[in-house]
Amino acid sequence: MRVVILGSGVVGVASAWYLNQAGHEVTVIDREPGAALETSAANAGQISPGYAAPWAAPGVPLKAIKWMFQRHAPLAVRLDGTQFQLKWMWQMLRNCDTSHYMENKGRMVRLAEYSRDCLKALRAETNIQYEGRQGGTLQLFRTEQQYENATRDIAVLEDAGVPYQLLESSRLAEVDPALAEVAHKLTGGLQLPNDETGDCQLFTQNLARMAEQAGVKFRFNTPVDQLLCDGEQIYGVKFGDEVIKADAYVMAFGSYSTAMLKGIVDIPVYPLKGYSLTIPIAQEDGAPVSTILDETYKIAITRFDNRIRVGGMAEIVGFNTELLQPRRETLEMVVRDLYPRGGHVEQATFWTGLRPMTPDGTPVVGSTRFKNLWLNTGHGTLGWTMACGSGQLLSDLLSGRTPAIPYEDLSVARYSRGFTPSRPGHLHGAHS
């Protein structure tokens, strides 16, 4: 069938690839001149299924109050006066108890683990290049309390069958030799050896080229005005005087999905602003070997071939994309503290992006009350980690195939009572 995908970030392009491979005629529409030029452009670069976890966690409300008075706080809030922001924050607060946290983390890890398997299969099939590494992820703790709290997450990892190592500070250099110089500042770490890293933008643009060669059409420089609907069906995508029609439509506009779906489907996806630095490597033996997660500052430090990507922080400030110097200083402080010889920080490229975040941290993937409208959005800080799995899952659902993982709790249905997701394969002409 003919499928239109709205959005050419990593999630949209992955969706296009898997739908094309399933035999569908796919068109991708985006306002930008190319793929992966917004949120997917310079994210932290880690593919970390085991660390997939919601920001809505026990203790976060109290921490948020403390962070208001800290210079290098990982989370900041600025009220924008909108009812949507207040509602979203209230929903997030309601997910900050242990029960919700464990449930949300469990389904996030499930999708993220599946996504890594899909990426591995894609890499074996296509030999796609993206400066990828399979060196695992190491979460660093600066306090004894953080080290002790890791046992909560370990329970979820064990349930999901994710291998891990809980390391004392004296053993951190076994995983990342450059940390030997700063181990005295740390209390320990949690290593997940199966995690990966890679340049998300490079991956997305290379996958887009492969998809185009396979028959996917890309309509760039095409700002969408609205989705046209009639009854329980979408009948077109309007931009200017032109209307593109298809049999099915996939919303993958990231943070902009909510506004585009207004009056059609209500989804709680809010822009969570983040920042990154991309730094040329100075000394090879002083740079990280894979991905490091600083638990205190919620910042990731990732190794590419000849660059270090430092990314993180979260600002609930609406669609503000201003580059704030204090945020740059925080990123510089963390990377200099952990890898003082690693990179030419003064030559860094500073970037910001808006991650599409749901209040429970889990993305929205699946059907809607509209028979031919599908969602693949709301991946928050884990779009790169979850992209391939979300794309394959969406392709299976839209094509009428039984997905490889449970998916009901990933749909928009979880936000409303009495709503049952459409049966997979309900569209006439769906491929089997």
Swiss-Prot record:
Its EC number is 1.4.99.-. The lineage of its organism: Bacteria, Pseudomonadati, Pseudomonadota, Gammaproteobacteria, Enterobacterales. Keywords: FAD, Flavoprotein, Oxidoreductase. FAD binds at residues 3-17. This is D-amino acid dehydrogenase. GO terms for molecular function: D-amino-acid dehydrogenase activity. Signal peptide: none annotated. Gene3D superfamilies: D-Amino Acid Oxidase, subunit A, domain 2, FAD/NAD(P)-binding domain. One of its GO terms (biological process) is D-alanine catabolic process. Oxidative deamination of D-amino acids. It catalyses: a D-alpha-amino acid + A + H2O = a 2-oxocarboxylate + AH2 + NH4(+). One of its GO terms (cellular component) is cytoplasm. Its cofactor is FAD. The keyword Oxidoreductase applies.
